[in-house]
Amino acid sequence: TRLRCDWSSDVCSSDLPVGPLRLIDEIGFDISSHAGASLHKAFGERLNPSLALVALSETDRLGKKGGQGFYQYEKGRREKPDESIYGELQIPVPAEPQKFSDHEIRARLVLQMINEATHALQDGIVQRADQVDLALIMGTGFPPFRGGLLRFADTLHPRSILYHIRKLEEVYGTRFTPAPLLIDLAERDRTFYQAFGT
């Protein structure tokens, strides 16, 4: 697995307080890998663990708490991307980072989150859309001005979300297979808050 972000732009952060690579550094590779294994055990192929993260968790690299993660840290402050990580993954340092548009990066992150939130509703883990929104605002720092993940999803509409997730599924496979509930909402022309509102 290659690291696909152009680190210099840190565009991965989108509207979130930190981007995914920095978040993993904050949490630590060991804990992130353990969480990934637990999610895989609970949800199977839908949430395969990152092979790169598993490999990194088996090294001395711990993330920010160890001073070395995706970024180098001095005195607890993020300094710059740590390109030595490529050696630990046994892949060459790319001459040019793969370029993805800001829109594509945000879409891949947010559509994946919406799809998993849909699974949580479908599986009865949560009963209402506002529960998902509160959990993501309080737990991940999802921007409150968006109203929460599913309130934001409703501004896009499940039909549009389904269309874009299916496009990603064509390119990236089962990681983007749409939740059956998302298909149902799109077919019935219902939003999350219409179907699962308070």
Language-model segments: which ranges?
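Single conserved hydrophobic/aromatic residue that forms the stacking wall/gate
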Residues: 1-11
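N-terminal glycine-rich phosphate-binding loop for ADP-containing cofactors
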Residues: 9-198
